[in-house]
Amino acid sequence: MRLRLEREGAVATLLIDRPRQHNAMNQAMWEQLPRLVQEAMADEAIRVLILTSATPGLFCAGADIHEFARCSGDEEWRVANQAAIRATQYALAQAEKPVIAAIDGDAVGGGCGLAIACDLRIASPAARLGITPAKLGIVYGLFDTKLLVDLVGPARAKRILFTAALHDAQEALAIGLIDQILPAPLEAAMELAHAMAANAQHSIRSSKAIVRRILDGQADDDGETLAMFRDAFTLPDFREGVQAFRGKRRPCF
């Protein structure tokens, strides 16, 4: 299997495993990845998802260019490929639970697109990130581009797209493409994921949903966001949090 889902307690890890091709994503993988994300979201025992490579020193080299060259003359394939890539980005970006990318190597083109669709990105010092359609004569989709603009702002997004440059980890951190540089990104992501998993899940998932609404242009509360606030006071997590605070102990959510 070139993609697989592993579980460790409340954390699932989605592994990209195609090392001979530097984890380049072919059509079958683009179609499979959203299903694995949905599997993790549907598993009530899972609270956080990590996206990473099964092979140290790699993340994802993007789309399979050999497949592009072989199949791009087929309009039906182009439509299916565009739909599968968008479905992958959407599944990661709209996942109700937190998603962390652990990047230990190059995240290029569609590989960088996978990373920016996650909530947080932890990279090794050796990581490089870039979005390179301008070197291939192709166009990055609007949904993917919005994720980039939301993350780094329009001016930096334009520079990333227009230059098609690869950015080392320090530069990627400086421009906001990643959140942290650590020598063992998967271990750090796992530690962070377990810390998140120990917190109140209604709080985390509601916060993620509210941030998403803000990025989509919503500027004030509506009935759904007001309900998130009100409902929190009726849930077991609130009662446990208050009791733990009063008892000077860690809450058990």
Whereabouts are the PLM-identified features?
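CoA-thioester-processing core
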Residues: T88-Q94, A102, V108-L161, I175, ...
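C-terminal long alpha-helix characteristic of the crotonase
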Residues: I122-A127, I178-E224, R230, T234-P236, ...
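Acidic, divalent-metal-coordinating active-site segment for phosphoryl/phosphodiester hydrolysis
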Residues: A165-E171
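Glycine- (often His-adjacent) and acidic-residue-rich active-site loop
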Residues: S53-T88, G217
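Glycine-rich phosphate-binding loop at the start of an alpha helix
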Residues: G62, Q82, R86, G109, ...
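Short loop-to-helix capping motifs
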Residues: R18-P19, D43, D74, N199, ...
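Conserved CoA-thioester-binding segment of acyl-CoA-metabolizing enzymes
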Residues: M1-T52, Y90
